[in-house]
Amino acid sequence: MLTVKGLNKSFGENEILKKIDMKIEKGKVIAILGPSGSGKTTLLRCLNALEIPNRGELAFDDFSIDFSKKVKQADILKLRRKSGMVFQAYHLFPHRTALENVMEGPVQVQKRNKEEVRKEAIQLLDKVGLKDKMDLYPFQLSGGQQQRVGIARALAIQPELMLFDEPTSALDPELVGEVLKVIKDLANEGWTMVVVTHEIKFAQEVADEVIFIDGGVIVEQGPPEQIFSAPKEERTQRFLNRILNPL
């Protein structure tokens, strides 16, 4: 579905991603783990060109972009339309209701029929358990509810790929479960997803493949049972020990 080859990203002289190669297959869930500053979020943002890589290639089923050459804006927009992004900090429009937030992309960007979009948006809010909150504004919602609206908003553009940037990191611990349940349900429905997360149990249960990144490179990748039970790389072992045994 999506193939990444030789992806590099620098900010000034600081090289954040170094020759990243990965493949995302349709219907699979990939969990990306790594310490703070490892390049996880930058990689995720490069996958839909919120950050433009300096070099490397992204190839979807029907087209590819070579970032070592001049990139057409039309290709950037085409790439972005194929993926829905869920952010750490929700990024909802504060002056719009939950329903209006979900409708925004299809109506304003895709120029779809407003009544048709409204029906779909209500169904999506129902899907994430928030149909009864559709007329509330973000400040009237809990963090977990806001993030679930964010998921519905990302789904509304009918993407081929869902990207989650630490979707529970800004939540109180008691609200984490409600967001993870929605993501698990999407996985069970066969959505293709890349999730940057520190939720090890979630990654074990849901991911088809786990990628561990440190220093801008993929240190190790494999099925969750291998990564969590018998990691091959010493750096992966140290990271997991620190996460699983914090004291």
From Swiss-Prot:
Its EC number is 7.4.2.-. Residues 2-240 form the ABC transporter domain. It comes from the Bacteria. ATP binds at residues 34-41. Signal peptide: none annotated. GO terms for cellular component: plasma membrane. One of its GO terms (molecular function) is ATP hydrolysis activity. Keywords: Amino-acid transport, ATP-binding, Cell membrane, Membrane, Nucleotide-binding, Translocase, Transport. It is found in: Cell membrane. It is a peripheral membrane protein. Part of the ABC transporter complex TcyABC involved in L-cystine import. Responsible for energy coupling to the transport system. Belongs to the ABC transporter superfamily. L-cystine importer (TC 3.A.1.3.14) family. The complex is composed of two ATP-binding proteins (TcyC), two transmembrane proteins (TcyB) and a solute-binding protein (TcyA). This is L-cystine import ATP-binding protein TcyC. The lineage of its organism: Bacteria, Bacillati, Bacillota, Bacilli, Bacillales.
